Amino acid sequence: MPFSLLPRTIVHGLPDLTPKMLKKLGVELLMLDFDNTVVPYTTDVPTPAVRAWFRTMQASGIRLCVVSNSKKERVQQFCRQWDIPCFTHCRKPSRKGILRAAEAMKAPLQACALAGDQIYTDTLAANRAGVRSILVEPIHLHNVWLRLRHVAELPFIHLAKRRMKHEQSD
């Protein structure tokens, strides 16, 4: 797949991804980055809004899984708590972890999407794997490196928003 840093969709947070929206996009399997997408880096406890979103998504029939670069036990504990599959050591922006998750979940790539907070890892990996890339605003930019990375991503975010606006007007 092409090397692209432009997400196909941008949302404020996971609760903005509704089952209706995802079904309209043809998404059957939503892969989730973990840190700063589902929960902040500093905790494994989701906000009440994200907990409600998980319940809504699970009731909707859209399947969920976590694809994380992390190897930490806390990711696996979280996934056990919510009864969702977890794929760690994904090495995004490599596409291998995404392809491994899609194959394990028996989902065709065209029916998959990856929601994550980083363009240089999540968006790039999704685009390279041939799944829909969904950029979620980071939950918390708690240190200077995260803020600097986010600033470096802003040109791509602006380009993607312009493209999305143009596609909606067609």
Where are these regions (language model features)?
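Asp-based, Mg2+/Mn2+-dependent phosphohydrolase catalytic module
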Residues: 2-32, 39, 43-44, 48-114, ...
